[in-house]
């Protein structure tokens, strides 16, 4: 299974890019690497719950609705 690694940079939908700062078994703490339409504050740290997609890779949803952007550990 592909997992998020601390220090890794991952690109999601709509060219959203994040850098993983910390990781636990169930959550990751990250910041955005560049401004984007979703979030302009790139210095703020965010924490989201990790979800598993078909045991192939980990993913996080950036919003609370299924249609909002997500980032996968590829």
Description of each model-found segment:
Residues 10-15, 71-74:
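His-enriched metal-coordination microenvironments in redox/metal-binding proteins
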Residues 37-74:
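Intrinsically disordered, low-complexity, charged/polar segments
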């Amino acid at each position: 299974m592909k997992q998020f690694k601390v220090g890794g940079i991952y690109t999601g939908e709509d060219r959203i890019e994040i850098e993983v700062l910390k990781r636990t078994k169930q959550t990751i703490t990250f910041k955005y690497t560049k401004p984007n339409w979703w979030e302009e504050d790139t210095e703020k740290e965010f924490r989201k719950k990790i979800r598993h997609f078909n045991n192939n890779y980990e993913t996080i949803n950036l919003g609370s609705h299924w249609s909002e952007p997500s980032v996968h550990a590829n």
